[in-house]
Regions:
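N-terminal ligand-binding/catalytic initiation module
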Residues: 1-113, 120-122, 129-132
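Glycine-rich Rossmann-fold phosphate-binding loop(s) that bind the pyrophosphate
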Residues: 141
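Hydrophobic/small residue at the entry helix of a nucleotide-binding pocket
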Residues: 144
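Conserved small/polar residues in nucleotide/adenosyl-binding loops
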Residues: 153-162
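Residues that form or flank phosphate/diphosphate-binding pockets in enzymes
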Residues: 116, 147
Length: 162
């Protein structure tokens, strides 16, 4: 009997997958696997839709020994703000590595990508920052600046200057 496909919204994912030390450790483990295992990761597929200033990127990878893999679909339509819509969104499809059956749809609207990027910054800081560093400078004021700040606080205490 086939199990039903799990559908998680951005709200669900924000509740279930916070930007915390476990997320930072997970991303570090993923980088380690990419560097040390025979990870299958094809080039990014990019579909341009020039008449609407749009593009869609599709990314995936498979790590041997992990029961599932995901396919990320990431559209960017850069005139959308003039329509009152976000310029980017996205979703991921989680499949069984054994059967190829769809297990879950993650309707994250880019949240998981934002989380991964912030956690990757924390991994870099963990390995490249001086151990006695007491502050971090973050240039920018958007979503990534805020998320980088949160991710760093999980590594060590930093002062915040606005």
């Amino acid at each position: 009997m086939r199990t039903p496909v799990i559908i998680l919204t951005e709200t669900d994912l924000r509740r279930l997958v916070p930007l915390d030390l476990a997320a930072v450790d997970c991303i570090e483990d993923a980088f380690r696997a990419l560097a040390t295992q025979a990870v299958a990761m094809p080039p990014v597929l990019r579909l341009d839709i020039p008449e609407h200033r749009g593009e869609v990127d599709v990314k995936t990878a498979y790590v041997p020994g992990i029961d599932h893999f995901a396919i990320k679909i990431s559209p960017g339509f850069f005139d959308n703000p003039t329509l009152g819509l976000p310029s980017t969104n996205g979703m991921m499809v989680v499949l069984s590595a054994r059967t190829g059956l769809v297990q879950a749809l993650l309707l994250d609207n880019g949240y998981l990508t934002d989380l991964r990027t912030a956690a990757a910054g924390a991994v870099a800081a963990r390995h490249l920052a001086r151990q006695d560093a007491e502050s971090a400078a973050i240039l920018g004021a958007g979503m990534q600046a805020r998320m980088q700040s949160v991710s760093y606080t999980h590594l060590r205490a930093h002062e915040t200057r606005g």
